[in-house]
Amino acid sequence: MHFHERFDVIVVGGGHAGTEAALAAARMGSKTLLLTHNIDTLGQMSCNPAIGGIGKGHLVKEIDALGGAMAIATDYAGIQFRTLNSSKGPAVRATRAQADRALYRQKIQNILQNQPNLRIFQQAVDDLIVENHQVVGVVTQMGLAFESPAVVLTTGTFLSGKIHIGLENYSGGRAGDPPAIALANRLRELPIRVGRLKTGTPPRIDANTIDFSQMTEQKGDSPLPVMSFMGDVSHHPKQISCWITHTNEKTHEIIRGGLDRSPMYSGVIEGIGPRYCPSIEDKIHRFADKSSHQIFIEPEGLNTNEIYPNGISTSLPFDVQLNLVRSIKGMENAEIMRPGYAIEYDYFDPRDLKNSLETKAINGLFFAGQINGTTGYEEAGAQGLLAGMNASLQVQGKEAWCPRRDEAYLGVLVDDLSTLGTKEPYRMFTSRAEYRLLLREDNADIRLTAKGRELGLVDDARWAAFSEKLESIELELQRLRGQWVHPNSPLIHALNPHLNTPISREASFEELLRRPEMDYSKLMQIEGFGPGLEDPQAAEQVQIQVKYSGYIQRQQEEINKAVRNENTGLPLTLDYKEVPGLSNEVIAKLNNHKPETIGQASRISGITPAAISILLVHLKKRGLLRKSA
């Protein structure tokens, strides 16, 4: 049975990747269908109730700069906001928000339901319709076929998902949801490499059974940060505290005593878990010398008693979970509301994707989120936006787009995945980026919003606000460069008390701001130098662009050298055995990876600069030298 309408883009799955993919395609004018097994769980935060953090906050800002929903929803749902690394340089500062699950889900659903060009339909997908290596639609559980030349799969942990608690296990996509078995079996028929990964979640605790007086209170920041460039503090709901406690030697003894019934340590789970978010049993085993581990006690919302104990993700049997929880200071009488568990699921080797997130094997089929081996809401949302955008571009007959590594953390993420692949759940860190001074949270809009506007992702309101901000920054920089103060100026009496060394020669306001003891807000408060910019985002940009101008210029020069051959395209049909001069090892690796560009090829382990030179000569001789989009 065929549905009565055709769609330009179909998105399968309504998590963080799926919602951003559907919204992106619809914003660009494509007639879009979002298929989900349950409309009520669209935008669900399946694991921790938080958005942002080191590297992750940068991705959220980039999603926002391209018109996405994640940051906006976080501003409306965030019950505690903090700026991490605030004492460090701007490149590694990151915003993190504790979020009310219900408010976040509610805001995402509201955005989806009010998005033009977007239809939502509740049905699980069991099959893909593929003809001559081209996707042409999907078939749902009840045999209903939907036709489309572009399909984005954002299946999360649902593909052959298996939930483990102790030595017991059962099929599930997450707690309370069925797995996608039929779709997983269908995908295994495709010429794409498949593997298994695992992730986990901690038990949820009843707040009424916790003694918070035994814990350290952790308040949010003041003044309050915002996540979206369009956000405002007035959007935030009531702000509340989190708390900190620790495991102890007794906790560790209980965990060690239960390892024989752990699915991870008894060989029941084969999938590899996230390195940077390990289970508590993994921490105790790997860091046996540590006598305690920190636990963040995080409320799940304003109108729920559920507490998320961040740091004790576990798949141990329930009796062991209860004992280990009650061994922790402040939780001696705690009651578990939901047990912790591990979930194992299928993922597909992202090296089989183009950097548009389209599969190399099937035209029009895109993957985004955990299906590509990543972990985290932010990583999923960023991929979803890119996949939905490129699906829409393809339907419109336009070239795909993906930012370079020097343009966005999204570019780093996709390049890492499509070039190097991953054997464990991949999460973003600032340390993964070579050019992180240019890839800051604060300038994500300056880097990406103009491109988003060109692609059709950015609406009029965001574009107007961005243009106004950009103009105010430029005018203020011109003012600082054009106004001067000299030793005999009447302004000097107000200025000198704020300087480590008094002014001895004429200096521009810009030079004064560059001094280490001076910052923008301080300079603007001195009589005769203000009033300056009212918009704190614009003021921050002025300060960073002035103070770091030398470093930024140097990094830009490095990038200009590096990108000379970065985008030189490599035909996916090229058989590297035909390239004379390449070693057998290099030939095998290049034929295995099928890189899209010289830049990607150069980042594959074992591909030498000499091999790259040989490739460039071969391409030139064959008339194949071309620049990738």
Swiss-Prot record:
Compartment annotation: Cytoplasm
Ranges that cross the membrane: none
Biological processes per GO annotation: tRNA methylation; tRNA wobble uridine modification
Residue sites binding FAD per the record: G13, G14, G15, H16, A17, G18
UniProt xrefs under Gene3D superfamilies: FAD/NAD(P)-binding domain, GidA associated domain, C-terminal subdomain, tRNA uridine 5-carboxymethylaminomethyl modification enzyme MnmG/GidA
Keyword NAD: yes
Chain coiled-coil ranges: none
InterPro entries: FAD/NAD-bd_sf, GIDA_C_N, MnmG, MnmG-rel, MnmG-rel_CS, MnmG_C, MnmG_C_subdom, MnmG_C_subdom_sf
Cofactor(s) recorded in Swiss-Prot or TrEMBL: FAD
Function: NAD-binding protein involved in the addition of a carboxymethylaminomethyl (cmnm) group at the wobble position (U34) of certain tRNAs, forming tRNA-cmnm(5)s(2)U34.
Family named by the database record: Belongs to the MnmG family.
Stated name of the protein: tRNA uridine 5-carboxymethylaminomethyl modification enzyme MnmG
Source organism per UniProt: Shewanella baltica (strain OS155 / ATCC BAA-1091)
Gene (UniProt): mnmG
